[in-house]
């Protein structure tokens, strides 16, 4: 998260596949980053209080060469200007450099999913959604941890416990919102490993 060091390896892999196996694939360069809403956190001199608010996940995809340049700029800003425990990106800075980028709402740790999870008012959800170019949903198994024990002594004591029906309802709500706002809704895996045996490394 927040880094793009895999780009050279991805480019080499794609080149090798084409040369050795005749497989031509298109790489979509991007990253999953950490975003926070800096509304109300900018002082008179333009400085941003970037340590006081929690972050959410966000997807930044480069659609053009300008988008690639802006993605690199955002990665640099997040590490050099807004790093606090993790490389953070203020929404205002993303807006300034979003030309050529496609911005997605990410996984359950994304701002949009969390708004539904916390049952925010409809107007607030729509305002949040307006920032994103496309919305994401994932398979129920990806978010099944939200249905696990949240009682005292449980693994997730600070979370509201959901049911499988709740998970389906959130996905349906995101799809409906996408249709209403005419935004694409993408079903993704949010994959972090490629086999059961690799799970331990996460």
Predicted regions and their residues:
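Phosphodiester-processing cores and adjacent nucleic acid-binding clamps
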Residues: 1-202
């Amino acid at each position: 998260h927040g880094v793009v060091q895999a780009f050279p390896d991805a480019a080499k892999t794609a080149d090798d596949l084409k040369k050795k196996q005749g497989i031509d694939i298109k790489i979509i360069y991007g990253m999953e980053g950490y975003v926070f809403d800096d509304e109300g956190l900018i002082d008179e001199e333009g400085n941003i209080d970037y340590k006081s608010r929690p972050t959410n996940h966000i997807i930044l995809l480069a659609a053009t060469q300008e988008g690639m340049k802006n993605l690199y700029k955002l990665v640099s800003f997040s590490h050099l200007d807004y790093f606090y425990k993790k490389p953070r990106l203020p929404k205002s800075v993303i807006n300034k450099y979003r030309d050529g980028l496609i911005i997605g709402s990410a996984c359950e740790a994304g701002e949009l999913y969390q708004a539904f999870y916390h049952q925010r008012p409809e107007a607030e959800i729509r305002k949040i959604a307006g920032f994103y170019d496309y919305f994401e949903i994932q398979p129920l198994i990806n978010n099944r941890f939200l249905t696990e024990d949240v009682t005292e002594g449980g693994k997730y004591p600070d979370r509201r416990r959901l049911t499988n029906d709740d998970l389906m309802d959130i996905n349906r709500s995101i799809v409906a919102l996408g249709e209403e706002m005419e935004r694409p809704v993408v079903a993704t895996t949010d994959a972090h490993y490629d086999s059961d045996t690799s799970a331990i490394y996460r």
